[in-house]
Amino acid sequence: MSEIVKSMRQITKENEGIQVYVFMSRAAQQVLRLYGLTKDLENVSNKIFLEIDANRTEPFYYLPGALQVGKFKLFLICPATANTVAKIVNGIADTLITNAAAQAAKANVPIYIYPVDSAEDNLTTTLPDGSKLQLTMRKIDIENARRLSTMENFNVFTNIAVLKEIIDNHP
C-alpha cells in the first residue's frame, strides 16, 4: 500500500495540474488508517470520496455516470482485492468500484487494474506493526487475475513501477 501512495506522490509532483480523485470503500479507509497512510493519500489527491453504495459516495459523486460521459481519461483501480477482481470477471457490479468498472468498460474508458493476488509465487507482506506475513496465493485468485487480463478495456499490471508510464500515456 505504501508503494502505491509513494508512486502517486511522485506522479502528482511530476505532472502539474493532474487531477487525482480517490474513491474508496470503508474497508480501504480502515486499512489506510492502520498503515498510517491517510494523510499521505490526502496530500496526493484532489478529493477523496468514501463509498456509500454501488452508486453513491460521501461527499456525493456519481462515479459510474462520470466515467460514462467522459469526465475521466482513465479509470485506475489500484490496488484491486481478490474479491473485486472476482466480481469484475463474473460481471457482478454491486460495489462502487465494480459498478464503475462495468460502466467504464461499456463507455470504452481505459481501465488499469492492479490485482494484488496475481502472482503464482507466495508473497511476503508487511503488517502495520512492521512484522512480515507470508501469504499463499490461491489458484482461483490467480486465475481470475489472468481472466481479467483478457477482458476488453481492462489493462492489468502487476508492477507499481508502471503507474507513471500509465499516467504519461493519458495526458
Q: Residue spans of the language-model regions?
A:
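A cross-family phosphate/adenosyl-ligand binding-site feature
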Residues: M1-P171
